[in-house]
């Protein structure tokens, strides 16, 4: 079996190494039947993407983020946050001044990054943002924990938003609450504790899908035997222990536990098991079995999938990218560092479930069983948006939401970058000459000295086109 992808650059092709004649004539291989060999050819028309000339903005309307060395995990998270418009609008409305430096201010660095993602025509650097984190070059070449980065960034923004018009935005978007309870079986005693969360960690191992993980999350544990619960004045009692949800946030972030410690092998391992996640997630299912008695049953907890963050590789390294539906339409986009491409739903969902995949054996002379291989690319984080809140969250963000000083500063930076780019592109058309005029000769040599050399460091320079006629320059 062989294949070739024809393109404008490679429009002619011959399959010179299709199969050795000796193998074709070998009776045990089964290619010749009644002195006849059947050759099957398949032709498909596909859209060829030239990596070097590919323009993400032109093809998709979006631009990517540059990788500083090992910051692809951060890039996928930043793209996900940027494409939550309500969050982006709140970041733009954080108070910053023209005297702030992006490298020393997380809010300004994030505003600058988001502005460039929104208005640039090419990929955007994250160096200002990582400098505002206090990172050096070494940090940029180390992969950090995505969940930890998400929490630290949220905490810092939450703190910076206090006392401003956008105070409480992080909580409004991402904060939910659950109730931890212990209830005695034989006596009337119950202990409860309310806790908040900004994301939920769901088990992958032993769970078929997201619903199975939620079932496990609220699973009731029995406290009995040597593990009885001490119920204050009631002493040791048999009890039930569990968790139920009081409310879910408008933007639900689910961290899938793809990495865990293996006690048998005394090392961290990656769980590549097949794990399914739905396009729509109904957390009111089965009469609200995930909800506590205090939950508001008037709130409809039906969610639609917004982002799928993917890890490709093993426990000690790999690559991160994200599939995102910025407007929750049917069109998915893959954000892979600098490159943004359009993708279909199957690519974003089913192909990120993980597990094993079969490759059928196509050799007609052998009766082989299908070959299975483990898929090391799979989802590790999911972002869902509640249906009843999507019109508020997927809102319009335009220039009026951006501080004037930020627009002016970044527009100047953009113009200066374009000037340097144009100058570099046209550099081969120009040359620098120095011209010693009569005034220079008089000033440097004097009236009575005629043969000493002129100091050309002190005469004016001119940048001229190489093709410019002398008469025009004169």
Regions found by a protein language model. Give the residues of each.
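Active-site nucleophilic cysteine motif
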Residues: 67-80, 141-152, 317-319, 382, ...
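Exposed substrate/partner-binding surface patches
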Residues: 31-60, 81-83, 91-104, 108, ...
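Short, recurring structural edge motifs at helix starts
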Residues: 26, 169-172, 457-463, 474
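Conserved, non-catalytic sequence blocks in retroelement Pol enzymes and Pol-derived host proteins
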Residues: 100-101, 138-145, 173-175
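Short, contiguous acidic and Ser/Thr-rich linear segments
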Residues: 64-70, 449-472
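Protein/peptide-recognition domains central to ubiquitin and immune signaling
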Residues: 1-55
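Cys/His-enriched microdomains
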Residues: 180-182, 229
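Carboxylate-rich, divalent-cation-coordinating active-site regions
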Residues: 72, 184, 254
């Amino acid at each position: 079996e062989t294949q070739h992808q024809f393109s404008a650059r490679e429009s002619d092709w011959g399959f010179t190494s299709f199969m050795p004649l000796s193998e074709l004539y070998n009776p045990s291989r089964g290619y010749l039947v009644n002195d006849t060999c059947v050759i099957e050819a398949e032709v498909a028309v596909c859209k060829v993407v030239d990596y070097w000339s590919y323009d993400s903005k032109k093809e998709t309307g979006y631009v990517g983020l540059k990788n500083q060395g090992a910051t692809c995990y951060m890039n996928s998270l930043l793209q996900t946050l940027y494409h939550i418009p309500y969050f982006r609008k709140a970041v733009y409305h954080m108070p910053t001044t023209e005297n702030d430096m992006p490298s020393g201010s997380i809010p300004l660095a994030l505003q600058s990054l988001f502005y460039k993602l929104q208005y640039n025509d090419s990929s955007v650097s994250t160096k200002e943002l990582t400098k505002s984190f206090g990172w050096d070059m070494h940090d940029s070449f180390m992969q950090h924990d995505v969940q930890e980065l998400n929490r630290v960034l949220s905490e810092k923004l939450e703190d910076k938003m206090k006392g401003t018009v956008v105070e409480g935005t992080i909580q409004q978007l991402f904060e939910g609450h659950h109730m931890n309870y212990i209830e005695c079986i034989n006596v009337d005693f119950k202990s409860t504790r309310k806790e908040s969360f900004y994301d939920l960690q769901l088990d992958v191992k032993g769970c078929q899908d997201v619903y199975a993980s939620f079932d496990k999350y609220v699973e009731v544990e029995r406290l009995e035997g040597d593990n009885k619960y001490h119920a204050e004045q009631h002493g040791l009692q048999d009890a039930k222990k569990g968790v139920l949800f009081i409310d879910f946030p408008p933007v639900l972030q689910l961290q899938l536990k793809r990495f865990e410690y293996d006690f048998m092998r005394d090392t961290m391992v990656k769980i590549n098991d097949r794990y399914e996640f739905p396009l729509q997630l109904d957390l009111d299912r089965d009469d609200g079995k995930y909800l506590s008695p205090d939950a508001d049953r008037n709130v409809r907890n039906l969610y639609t999938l917004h982002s799928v963050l993917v890890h490709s590789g093993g426990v000690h390294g790999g690559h991160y990218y994200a599939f995102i539906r910025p407007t929750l339409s049917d069109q998915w986009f893959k954000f892979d560092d600098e490159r943004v491409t359009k993708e279909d739903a199957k690519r974003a969902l089913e192909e990120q479930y993980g597990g094993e995949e079969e490759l059928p054996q196509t050799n007609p002379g052998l009766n082989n069983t299908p070959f299975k291989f483990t898929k090391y690319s799979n989802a590790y984080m999911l972002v869902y948006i509640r249906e009843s809140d999507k019109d508020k969250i997927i809102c319009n963000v335009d220039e009026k939401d951006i501080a004037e000083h930020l627009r002016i500063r970044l527009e100047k930076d953009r113009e200066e970058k374009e000037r340097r780019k144009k100058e570099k592109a046209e550099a081969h058309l120009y040359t620098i000459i120095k011209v010693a005029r009569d005034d220079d000769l008089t000033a440097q040599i004097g009236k009575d000295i005629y043969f000493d050399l002129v100091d050309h460091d002190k005469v004016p320079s001119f940048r001229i086109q190489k093709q410019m006629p002398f008469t025009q320059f004169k």
